[in-house]
Swiss-Prot record:
<dbReference type="InterPro" id="IPR007329">
    <property type="entry name" value="FMN-bd"/>
</dbReference>
<comment type="function">
    <text>Part of a membrane-bound complex that couples electron transfer with translocation of ions across the membrane.</text>
</comment>
<keyword id="KW-0249">Electron transport</keyword>
<dbReference type="GO" id="GO:0016651">
    <property type="term" value="F:oxidoreductase activity, acting on NAD(P)H"/>
</dbReference>
<dbReference type="GO" id="GO:0010181">
    <property type="term" value="F:FMN binding"/>
</dbReference>
<keyword id="KW-0813">Transport</keyword>
<keyword id="KW-1278">Translocase</keyword>
<keyword id="KW-0288">FMN</keyword>
<comment type="subunit">
    <text>The complex is composed of six subunits: RnfA, RnfB, RnfC, RnfD, RnfE and RnfG.</text>
</comment>
<keyword id="KW-0997">Cell inner membrane</keyword>
<feature type="modified residue" description="FMN phosphoryl threonine">
    <location>
        <position position="175"/>
    </location>
</feature>
<dbReference type="InterPro" id="IPR010209">
    <property type="entry name" value="Ion_transpt_RnfG/RsxG"/>
</dbReference>
<comment type="similarity">
    <text>Belongs to the RnfG family.</text>
</comment>
<dbReference type="GO" id="GO:0005886">
    <property type="term" value="C:plasma membrane"/>
</dbReference>
<keyword id="KW-1003">Cell membrane</keyword>
<keyword id="KW-0812">Transmembrane</keyword>
<keyword id="KW-0472">Membrane</keyword>
Length: 209
């Protein structure tokens, strides 16, 4: 009887150890797959705001943390540096439009260091479906209108919605949202013009984690 119980106990222990090991292996493989997919999605997003022909480095590996009120608030925002021939040429930077109709709007803006916008995407918002949500690339191509635009300075009158005398369309029944996004993209592009002297002093994203 005792031998039988001992044998069953050993069997159960071996089974438990095997199950635990298998679970650990599955979890490890799953985590690696999820991380890989997340990296691919991030790379695709970066390429939408800084087209791949503009750089030859690994932008994801050159992630830095910036904090400046020009980015909508004093929260840390991430910046991904683009290089060509080892020279900094542009960046993709997170920024916030704090004055959206339904709250803050989070964006990723790509621009060079001379005021030329390369691309922009809304990455988080709570705008009203059918009205303010046209800022989302999945709903309309309105956000693409910033690509190729140049910002000359803070007093550049073109950087406003048409209702305010600027160059960008507002939405029918929704002016607050596009106005907020136009301002945020403009401010991000202006901020990037000031960035090159600071690059060597920026903390990396790894240091921020």
């Amino acid at each position: 009887m005792l031998k039988t119980m001992r044998r069953h106990g050993i069997t159960l222990a071996l089974f438990a150890a095997g199950a635990t090991g298998l679970t650990a292996v599955v979890n490890s493989l799953t985590e690696n797959t999820i991380a890989h997919q997340a990296a691919l999605q991030q790379k695709a997003l970066l390429d939408q705001v800084v087209p791949a022909e503009n750089y030859d480095n690994d932008m994801q590996a050159e992630c830095y943390v910036v904090t400046d009120s020009a980015l909508g608030n004093m929260a840390p925002h991430r910046l991904y540096l683009a290089r060509k021939g080892n020279q900094p040429v542009a960046a993709a930077i997170e920024t916030t439009a704090p004055d959206g109709y339904s709250g803050a709007i989070q964006l990723l803006v790509g621009a060079d260091f001379h005021g030329n916008v390369l691309g922009s995407r809304v990455i988080e918002h709570h705008e009203t479906p059918g009205l303010g949500d046209k800022i989302d690339i999945r709903i309309s191509d309105w956000i693409n209108h910033f690509s190729g635009q140049h910002v000359t300075g803070d007093d550049d009158k073109r950087w406003a919605v048409k209702k305010d005398g600027g160059s960008f369309d507002q939405f029918t029944g929704a002016t607050i949202t596009p106005r907020a996004v136009v301002r945020a993209v403009k401010n991000a592009a202006l901020y990037l013009q000031t960035l090159p002297p600071q690059l060597s002093r920026l903390p990396s994203c790894g240091e921020d984690q």
